[in-house]
Amino acid sequence: AVCVSLLGAANIPPQSLNLYQFKNMIECAGTRTWLAYVKYGCYCGPGGTGTPLDELDRCCQTHDHCYDNAKKFGNCIPYLKTYVYTCNKPDITCTGAKGSCGRNVCDCDRAAAICFAAAPYNLANFGIDKEKHCQ
């Protein structure tokens, strides 16, 4: 099944469509809701500094770096770029032209979703004080 599913996306502002796809991909690959990652560690969620706190936080740091690399391809804006992929729980397949902005962003999100699903989740690292723990 194609998981682009824009049927439920009609009321979502265009600028969040990629994050909506990433959310669906996270939930395809694993068993946790995407909300479990929004404020996790030093790198999950917006921004990121310091040393990752654990394996899951490293997944988010790697995802940030992957997006940084995707930005190097012309005017690729990962947070705005939508893409096409299929989800056959827990398998995710990115489609589209290899090397294109959409495919690069999809590959970043796919790798992160798989990494999130495999990494242990430490509840103590959710909602931490980033000023204190991420320098």
UniProtKB/Swiss-Prot annotation:
InterPro entries named in the record: PLipase_A2 (IPR001211), PLipase_A2_Asp_AS (IPR033112), PLipase_A2_dom (IPR016090), PLipase_A2_dom_sf (IPR036444), PLipase_A2_His_AS (IPR033113)
Cell location: Secreted
Cofactor binding description: Binds 1 Ca(2+) ion.
Enzyme class: hydrolase
GO MF: calcium ion binding; calcium-dependent phospholipase A2 activity; phospholipid binding; signaling receptor binding; toxin activity
Transmembrane segments: none
GO BP: arachidonate secretion; fatty acid biosynthetic process; lipid catabolic process; phospholipid metabolic process; positive regulation of fibroblast proliferation
Protein name: Basic phospholipase A2 6
Organism: Bungarus fasciatus
